[in-house]
Amino acid sequence: MNIIDLGLIRYAEADALQRARLEEVAAGAEETLYLLEHHPVITLGRNGGGENLHVGREWLATQGIDLVQSSRGGNITCHFPGQLVAYPVFRVAKRPGGLRQMFHDLEEVVITTLAHFGLSAARWEGRPGVWIENRKICSIGMAVRRWTSYHGFALNVGRDLSLFEMITLCGLPDAQATSLYRELGGDAPTMQEVKDVCARQFRAIFADSTVAAGQAAL
């Protein structure tokens, strides 16, 4: 498994990278995990979500915020600097339990990463993602093509969650967004510290990892 840190990248560019790598992985290349942050973007999933957007596309454009229809599962969500995004391009068919188990394992990566920093997080039956009580700290939405996964999870790390004010989070009116900073304040880890722990948890839960030559990697 290659683990590649893409840094700060636009959504469309990361989507194109995933799709290209998916074709290679489906043909037998090594599985790849991309870790990154996105420039501000609001995405709509396969379940829709346009009705949960509180502002217009034109206004978003004036603020430099993209609005994108995504191929991932789920409803509306947003991405921004200060949020750790993980995109595993993995072969689903070879994994016991298939996509359902993979989804569970992604949640486990997040739960164990948060536990490392002293936060008790959990699954919520019927509500995908990872929660701290009624506060959502991580959204998960995946897609599968040629029995290979892409898209993944978005874990809120930093202070600024203002983009969530523009949407009804995942179409759930009672859902609140939180982050490691919101929960831990001055004791919150840096983005790099969260990336490092997240990478270790992926290795522990999914597989041993190797580093792609010539790429920034963890």
From Swiss-Prot:
Query: Keywords assigned by UniProt?
Result: Acyltransferase, Cytoplasm, Transferase
Return the broad EC class. Answer: transferase
Gene3D superfamilies, alphabetized = Bira Bifunctional Protein, Domain 2 (3.30.930.10)
- The BPL/LPL catalytic domain extends over 27-210
Catalysed reactions listed for this entry? octanoyl-[ACP] + L-lysyl-[protein] = N(6)-octanoyl-L-lysyl-[protein] + holo-[ACP] + H(+)
The main location class comes to cytoplasm
Marked site, Lowers pKa of active site Cys, at: 136
Protein residues bound to substrate: 72-79, 139-141, 152-154
Q: What positions constitute the catalytic site?
A: 170
Location of the protein in the cell: Cytoplasm
The GO molecular function terms of this record are: lipoyl(octanoyl) transferase activity
GO annotations of cellular component type? cytoplasm
User: Pathway listed for it?
Assistant: Protein modification; protein lipoylation via endogenous pathway; protein N(6)-(lipoyl)lysine from octanoyl-[acyl-carrier-protein]: step 1/2
Q: Its GO biological process terms? A: protein modification process
EC nos: 2.3.1.181
Identify its protein family.
Belongs to the LipB family.
Purpose: Catalyzes the transfer of endogenously produced octanoic acid from octanoyl-acyl-carrier-protein onto the lipoyl domains of lipoate-dependent enzymes. Lipoyl-ACP can also act as a substrate although octanoyl-ACP is likely to be the physiological substrate.
* Miscellaneous comment: In the reaction, the free carboxyl group of octanoic acid is attached via an amide linkage to the epsilon-amino group of a specific lysine residue of lipoyl domains of lipoate-dependent enzymes.
Write the protein's name. Answer: Octanoyltransferase
The organism of origin for this protein? Nitratidesulfovibrio vulgaris (strain DSM 19637 / Miyazaki F)
Classification lineage: Bacteria, Pseudomonadati, Thermodesulfobacteriota, Desulfovibrionia, Desulfovibrionales
